[in-house]
């Protein structure tokens, strides 16, 4: 178990994944986001939806938008659809994955 440099609760399970920040060699750096898992069908991959609010000055109103992120899901964390997770930026793991799950906080379902 290695220290990733962030104050998060380490997973209880142990995995053999090379791309795990806790048990493998993947280093994390950059932005940290929190969102809800909307899809977990891919192999060690999840899709995260985040709500972003923006101000439109012309109408003096706020708008809600959702953005999606594709992140690597290590077997030791194993987040499922409906979980609230914290992801952090890392080197590109694949063509679309540049984030990795570092903590699973709660389940909304």
From Swiss-Prot:
Originating species: Methanococcus vannielii
Superkingdom of origin organism: Archaea
InterPro entries documented for this protein: NA-bd_OB-fold, Ribosomal_uS17, Ribosomal_uS17_arc/euk, Ribosomal_uS17_archaeal, Ribosomal_uS17_CS
UniProt key word Ribonucleoprotein: yes
UniProt GO MF annotations: rRNA binding; structural constituent of ribosome
Assembly and oligomerization: Part of the 30S ribosomal subunit.
Protein name: Small ribosomal subunit protein uS17
One GO cellular component term noted in the UniProt record for this chain: cytosolic small ribosomal subunit
GO annotation, biological process: translation
Protein family (similarity comment): Belongs to the universal ribosomal protein uS17 family.
Any Pfam family: Ribosomal_S17
Described function: One of the primary rRNA binding proteins, it binds specifically to the 5'-end of 16S ribosomal RNA.
HAMAP family listed in its UniProt record: Ribosomal_uS17_A (MF_01345_A)
PROSITE patterns in the record: RIBOSOMAL_S17
SUPFAM superfamilies: Nucleic acid-binding proteins
Keywords assigned: Ribonucleoprotein, Ribosomal protein, RNA-binding, rRNA-binding
């Amino acid at each position: 178990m290695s220290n990733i440099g962030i104050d998060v609760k380490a997973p209880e399970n142990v995995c053999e994944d090379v791309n795990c920040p806790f048990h493998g060699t993947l280093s994390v750096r950059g932005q940290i986001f929190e969102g809800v898992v909307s899809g977990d069908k891919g192999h060690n991959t999840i899709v995260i939806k985040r709500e972003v609010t923006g101000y439109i000055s012309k109408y003096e109103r706020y708008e809600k938008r959702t953005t999606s992120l594709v992140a690597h899901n290590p077997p030791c964390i194993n987040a499922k659809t409906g979980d609230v997770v914290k992801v952090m930026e890392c080197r590109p793991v694949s063509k679309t994955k540049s984030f990795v799950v570092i903590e699973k906080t709660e389940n909304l379902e």
